[in-house]
Amino acid sequence: MAQLTQMTNEQLRELIEAVRAAAVGAAGSAAAAGGADASRGKGNFSACTHSFGGTRDHDVVEEFIGNIETYKDVEGISDENALKGISLLFYGMASTWWQGVRKEATTWKEAIALIREHFSPTKPAYQIYMEFFQNKQDDHDPIDTFVIQKRALLAQLPSGRHDEETELDLLFGLLNIKYRKHISRHSVHTFKDLLEQGRIIEHNNQEDEEQLATAKNTRGSKRTTRCTYCSFRGHTFDNCRKRQKDRQEEQHEE
């Protein structure tokens, strides 16, 4: 049969205080967690430094959208608050445009779609190809810059249009001849391969130019002197034989 444990009044008070403290602590933790959850989603764009003025440029628009999407996620801004505060990020033509279309956007996704639709509409594939093949690599264009620009255009095509091998085929003929002389098409299977080999060529060319400049300066510094009397190279005025001969003849005539 279980035995009852008798507690003194002092022990009973200590037990009650311990239970009360535990209850208060649990309530505080729950309130703090609830406050954190409540505060999450109540952020806004008031401190966001990214802005958009209405430039009709695909890269500019995508950079702006990417920046504000990241800011929204990091700050824990809800879709509702983001939609309410997106006007803070517009200025100039974009601000005027938003005043006219804001009622069309009832969700955050619709607002982003409107920005893309108006300032960066999807280009037809033929136009992208025209821009892609319009310019070849200039002699002074670094291969990194050229490849980045061309790949950005190809990225605007419908997803899955070309694999990487096909994109390399499209790009390879546009490379400057100084790269194609040293890089064969079958030696590169990825853009990483192409860039690595291209950088090696650029580094070697830079070394060649530096050595050529150094050699040119060295030749210039070792250039033989010119006699100011007879204008021939290889000797100076003081040891010019023609001057000495002419001087002897003058003395002889005297």
UniProtKB/Swiss-Prot annotation:
Record key words, sorted: Membrane, RNA-binding, Synapse, Transport
Tissue: Expressed in a specific population of brain neurons, named E347, that are necessary and sufficient for proper body fat storage.
Disruption of the gene: reported phenotype: Strong reduction in the number of synaptic boutons at neuromuscular junction in third-instar larvae.
Gene Ontology cellular component list: extracellular vesicle; membrane; postsynapse of neuromuscular junction; sarcomere; synapse; virus-like capsid
Conditions for induction: Up-regulated following stimulation of E347 brain neurons.
Localisation per UniProt entry: Extracellular vesicle membrane; Synapse
Domain notes: The protein is evolutionarily related to retrotransposon Gag proteins. It contains structural elements found within viral Gag polyproteins originated from the Ty3/gypsy retrotransposon family and retains the ability to form virion-like capsid structures that can mediate mRNA transfer between cells. Tetrapod and fly Arc protein-coding genes originated independently from distinct lineages of Ty3/gypsy retrotransposons.
Function: Master regulator of synaptic plasticity that self-assembles into virion-like capsids that encapsulate RNAs and mediate intercellular RNA transfer from motorneurons to muscles. Arc1 protein is released from motorneurons in extracellular vesicles that mediate the transfer of Arc1 mRNA into muscle cells, where Arc1 mRNA can undergo activity-dependent translation. Intercellular transfer od Arc1 mRNA is required for synaptic plasticity at the neuromuscular junction.
Family per similarity comment: Belongs to the ARC/ARG3.1 family.
Subunit structure: Homooligomer; homooligomerizes into virion-like capsids.
Protein name: Activity-regulated cytoskeleton associated protein 1
Originating species: Drosophila melanogaster (Fruit fly)
